[in-house]
């Protein structure tokens, strides 16, 4: 069956062997093992003017050879090569004489096929690391002996296959292998993402020097392609577009306006009650200036009281469903997103009804982007990507509409930076094109809702590990079984750096009793947050180092924050009951307004890709003896720098953003009633996602 799948996919894509034409002559095939970054590989290859096509991992070798592909790239994936459900592939892909680059899981597959072994190590690597490379290897030609790369894996190569040599290392972990004579190369890291500083050079070396690609493939005018697709799909029907006022939905609407007659486009802005301060008014004004008439609907009440249908339980595989709690009583991030997505569609249907439009003659248009679909594991984007979180515009109901062919997503193959370029080409004003993204569910996913603390049986042991890490210079003098675990998970270089940091600074690190969404090893994680506090002024470079190190040692931690103010003496072990109520939302709305106002006035808004401001149910600085209840909440500032929103880094104060700008935000937010402490998110993506939910 796998052979049939691979064959039919290739034939349907337009390769015609009967008349002797090889549609993919000189192109590269990307075999998709279910990576979160599969589409980024595709984009990076095309940026280098080489045609690329994505096909299932099980595509047979003979089909690749017959179609004339010049080289093969195998993506990463969430599986283990030894897992019973590991995806099937044709091992002959390595022996048909085509150059192969195996990335992450792809490297482990290659090593296993040729007799090497792969093991799950005690160390996870999720984040940015320095690796040593052999720059005499063709893949790494022109690079330094040490390179900064993104690693995200738990399995590691143990025994290297015969005929292969190690060409890159991350401490004692194999980060690259090569068999130069067979033109087979493996990278445990991700050269396709921006966090790998010279990733583009590595891909260029593979495509041009190793595979001999010619670089004649230039991207066609995608604007015309989008317009052609819209006209073809819609015909004389009408299109309802739900406008948030963000870049994506605005560019989508501008494209629809360009492709269709004005009376065919119905632009609706739904105020869901989770907008930023004065957001709806400014959206309406900005779009009117573009000549787009917008119908604004205040639907806050419908959203607060919205429900959806859910499976009886995660384990229940039957079609039985249950009705969810109302949104204002829901704490689960997944359920919140599903309710919001479904309520959006219900209101859209009501609008269609009020306007006496026939539902079968109306399409729903969305500004959905490629990363949204990849993170939701939608089949449109990737056959196998592991679910990280449901995007509000990719719920079950919307998937059903998509199956019926009633959803138009002209930007589904675009990444955020490409949408901005397209927006400029369409003549949209710069302030609209360059504004920070704001998620469709709005502030609803920036409130960490909780009724009780998140404390599992691993809480005390993880706290003990964090204590050892934060006081490493003293801990090494007192032997402890957990100290050996810390040492086993770190390189000598890491340990030296830890010694240096903890000798100079008085730090304490501990778990916070909440959980947030992250992405670790191409899989979704829903894990603890680690808080760090200190009596010293923050040394941001050291804090960023700790934020990279801690999730590697503690796989149940996917986020690390610095807590402003005096050292936290008694970390909270309970939470302030928090739901999406009007009071909670107005607190967050004000905090978000203050932080973004200061960022805008500083002139640094353009240097930061996005800055979610998050409200958490944490009340610090209470005397446990007085048994004071938890009634305040704390705010997190999450700066994020990225080119594609698939990976990214926090802005380091004193580097990408002035320290005084951050401190001004802290001062102003602290004035808001009911705020306990302010925290700064130090986490890269991975292991933490851009948003906390």
Curated annotation (Swiss-Prot):
It is found in: Cytoplasm, Cytosol. The keyword Cell membrane does not apply. It is an enzyme of class 6 (ligase). Pfam families: GATase (PF00117), GMP_synt_C (PF00958), NAD_synthase (PF02540). Pathway: Purine metabolism; GMP biosynthesis; GMP from XMP (L-Gln route): step 1/1. GO terms for molecular function: ATP binding; GMP synthase (glutamine-hydrolyzing) activity; GMP synthase activity. ATP binds at residues 244-250. Its cofactor is Mg(2+). SUPFAM superfamilies: Adenine nucleotide alpha hydrolases-like, Class I glutamine amidotransferase-like, GMP synthetase C-terminal dimerisation domain. The active site is at residues 104, 190, 192. Disulfide bonds: none annotated. It catalyses: XMP + L-glutamine + ATP + H2O = GMP + L-glutamate + AMP + diphosphate + 2 H(+). Residues 217-435 form the GMPS ATP-PPase domain. Residues 27-216 form the Glutamine amidotransferase type-1 domain. Homodimer. Catalyzes the conversion of xanthine monophosphate (XMP) to GMP in the presence of glutamine and ATP through an adenyl-XMP intermediate. PANTHER family: GMP SYNTHASE [GLUTAMINE-HYDROLYZING] (PTHR11922:SF2), GMP SYNTHASE-RELATED (PTHR11922). It is linked to A chromosomal aberration involving GMPS is found in acute myeloid leukemias. Translocation t(3,11)(q25,q23) with KMT2A/MLL1. This is GMP synthase [glutamine-hydrolyzing].
